Amino acid sequence: MVPFSSGPILASSASTAAHCQHRITDTHHVPHRPLVNSLDRAQAAKNKGNKYFKAGKYEQAIHCYTEAISLCPTEKTVDLSTFYQNRAAAFEQLQKWKEVAQDCTKAVELNPKYVKALFRRAKAHEKLDNKKECLEDVTAVCILEGFQNQQSMLLADKVLKLLGKEKAKEKYKNREPLMPSPQFIKSYFSSFTDDIISQPMLKGEKSDEDKDKEGEVLEVKENSGYLKAKQYMEEENYDKIISECSKEIDAQGKYMAEALLLRATFYLLIGNANAAKPDLDKVISLKEANVKLRANALIKRGSMYMQQQQPLLSTQDFNMAADIDPQNADVYHHRGQLKILLDQVEEAVADFDECIRLRPESALAQAQKCFALYRQAYTGNNSSQIQAAMKGFEEVIKKFPRCAEGYALYAQALTDQQQFGKADEMYDKCIDLEPDNATTYVHKGLLQLQWKQDLDRGLELISKAIEIDSKCDFAYETMGTIEVQRGNMEKAIDMFNKAINLAKSEMEMAHLYSLCDAAHAQTEVAKKYGLKPPTL
């Protein structure tokens, strides 16, 4: 037998394989007992491979791990799975992702709960752009690790977001436009006080009113798609509004600017931002149009940009609206909401203050100012400021007892402060004021879970929300999330799919797809490996 060379290690594959074999079989170099069985020889090859691996000599390591695999008795499944996983690690260093995935698959077949192999295969699938397979593997890892490893959870979150965006991009452009519920539409328009198109029709505009002697009003009304659209709006016959506005626009009628803005608004409401933008652009460019119309179009385009995660464009539009119509309270109200989303609380409060100065009766702005101050105090853990904000809420609901939003925001703050009983009372007041507002029932249902761990009552309230408004995507999303926590994945997936079909933006749809894909991955992992996360 030729003794193992003490000279430099050769780079060729043949020499490397020989080194492994000679090291294993040459008993002159083994000070202890001879390597009498295959497993010992396999372990020795693996150990030699580990030394090559640590030295950054990955090709040589691969040959040693291959030798270990060929020597290992097939019944030694745990050892064999380790050798495959080690070889996968070496392939990973060489960025041979297909080989990494193949070796990890062998390792997992031999040892189904082998976390290291599952995670390495997940990373290989990520590199190979196999998102679904990556998600299933990293989901199994998260469950096996009890959701304690930040690295695997970050990968799961990353791939879920990528899958969500990918699916939403395809689905959203082909979705059927869906008109929201009347309650949602009324709530939307109630956030504006300087919006001409949402104001009640003036005397002489309705078709059932007396005509003037000249017959001029009659002619305008009969030919005005915009005035018909306004009448349909008052009748809550929302599905006909876009087509009537289009008639006014096509005819280049007297109310063309108003019709463009109203049509754009309803395009936004049905989630068709691509159709809304040209109409908004046109209104903004009409220098001769009423400045209130142009400012309102800027507010709505700015809000649209924010929904599309374009904060710079959004900020530009709000600032332009403030420049052209500085006395418009809506500009400051909606810009304040934007500032909260951007975590610019002091600027948000300043905007709400300006809105209140211009419209002292604006209950919404006062309630949202209190909530902004509360969030700032809560985040900064400033107890005196928290108390001041809570006192502010009390003053708002006393001054504006008919403002449901005031009670709802106060309830959220009370929940944070674990004043659950009082929060529940606030939600009840919301329901008294707006019995058709499904969102309030969802929040009250979530409160029951947090407060009393009363799952049945919570689900009952969320089911009530769906009964009241079958288009409430928030209710379906919440129900799906609860079902995931209960381990009812099929029901959860059904709820998420219903929410997906109701999503009002591509970004919202992407988030819902992420939730749905997470539930689906857990279902697949349960089937393959018998793994389930802890449930409620």
Question: Where are the regions a protein language model picked out?
Answer:
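Alpha-helical tetratricopeptide repeat
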Residues: 1-536
